[in-house]
C-alpha cells in the first residue's frame, strides 16, 4: 500500500485580531491571505503561499486545510510518495486537488503534474487508500 507524505500541512497560528493577510508564517517563509475566524486563524476561503513554492488555495477551518482545495508543490519543492522503493518518486510541479479534513487529504483527489492529470487517488486521514490512472480521452481518427 502506498502512503502520501504531504509536506507539513498542519497550520498553527497565534495571530492577534482578525485580518485579511496573516504574516506569522514569515519565519517559515509562508503567508496567508484570506478569511479569518474570530480566533484569528484562517477560516473560510484563502490562499497560503510559501517561498519554497508550496501553496494551497481553498477552504480553511481553525487554521487547517479543510474542505475543497488545491495543494501545489512548484519546481522548488518536492512531494514524496512512500514507501520508498523503485516506485518511489520525488514529484515536482505537482498539484493535488480534492478534499481536506483537519489538515489532511481525505476523499477523492486528482494529482496533476504541469497541468496534466497523472493519477486519481482516494485518501483517508492523509493516507492513500486507492490509486488509479486517469482515463485517457478518446483520440479522434479519420
Go through each PLM region and give its residues.
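Sec-dependent N-terminal signal peptides
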Residues: 4-13
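Glycine/tyrosine- and acidic-biased, solvent-exposed loop/turn segments at the edges of beta-strands
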Residues: 14-142
Amino acid at each position: 500500500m502506498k502512503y502520501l507524505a504531504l509536506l507539513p500541512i498542519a497550520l498553527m497560528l497565534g495571530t492577534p485580531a482578525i485580518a485579511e493577510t496573516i504574516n506569522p508564517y514569515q519565519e517559515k517563509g509562508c503567508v496567508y491571505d484570506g478569511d479569518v475566524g474570530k480566533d484569528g486563524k484562517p477560516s473560510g476561503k484563502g490562499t497560503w503561499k510559501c517561498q519554497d513554492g508550496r501553496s494551497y488555495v481553498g477552504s480553511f477551518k481553525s487554521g487547517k486545510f479543510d474542505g475543497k482545495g488545491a495543494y501545489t508543490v512548484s519546481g522548488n519543492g518536492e512531494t514524496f510518495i512512500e514507501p520508498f522503493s523503485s516506485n518511489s518518486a520525488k514529484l515536482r510541479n505537482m498539484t493535488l486537488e480534492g478534499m481536506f479534513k483537519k489538515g489532511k487529504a481525505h476523499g477523492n483527489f486528482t494529482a496533476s503534474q504541469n497541468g496534466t492529470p497523472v493519477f486519481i487517488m482516494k485518501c483517508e486521514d492523509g493516507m492513500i487508500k486507492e490509486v488509479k490512472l486517469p482515463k485517457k480521452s478518446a483520440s479522434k481518427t479519420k
